[in-house]
Amino acid sequence: GWMRYRNSRQVTGVVKNVTVSQSSGKWYISIQTESEVSTPVHPSASMVGLDAGVAKLATLSDGTVFEPVNSLQKNQKKLARLQRQLSRKVKFSNNWQKQKCKIQRLHSRIANIRRDYLHKVTTTVSKNHAMIVIEDLKVSNMSKSAAGTVSQPGRNVRAKSGLNRPILDQGWYEMRRQLEYKQLWSGGQVLAVPPAYTSQRCACCGHTAKENRLSQSKFRCQVCGYTANADVNGARNILAAGHAVLACGEMVQSGRPLKQEPTEMIQATA
């Protein structure tokens, strides 16, 4: 039958499909529409390199830095406490179900904080730059478990696990996804380049060596003496790699297909 929902945005165009979903005890409705739009032209003509990291969420080649929000890290103790309380309850009992809902709501809050901050960051970058060059990072491979198997146990498992958590907490994949569709909508482009040695290469002379990286934040070339913030140097190398790709006449793409059909996704709380 019919039901009411909060119309958070005006629905425009021809409705193609409607999806109703539930998350953490709340119901959502997503409405996909199709409408004719003119080819967008990006208001900017600048090109920028973006270096994604853990200590800094994103560093641009022009020196702009976006600090991480670390929503999971800030709620880690509370999440652990709720999970301990869950383990003490009888499985599938009413109290167990209530405690499980509390954990789900906290997970949802952590994800919403991260997603909201990423939207603010990607909107700022997308509005100011027509072309964004990023590293073609394989996040799933970077965050794989190091535990190994019984016959071949992994090494430095605790250290690798400690690195995996902040990598996933930053939401690099989601940041890339948002940049791609926002650039598509605004007439800009996203170019993904190989990430190899961007943190070790000197953006001034091109000398590549692991000794150039003095620390997490300091970079000093052992040949020409060029010094800079390590993340800014990496972003400039990413930008230079993007220029090299364009100079070779290769097709500009982000590495994954983008749906060309103009759509609008509207989500409202039931």
Task: Please report, for each region that a protein language model flagged, where it lies by residue.
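Positively charged, helix-rich recognition surfaces that bind polyanionic ligands
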Residues: 4-15, 19-270
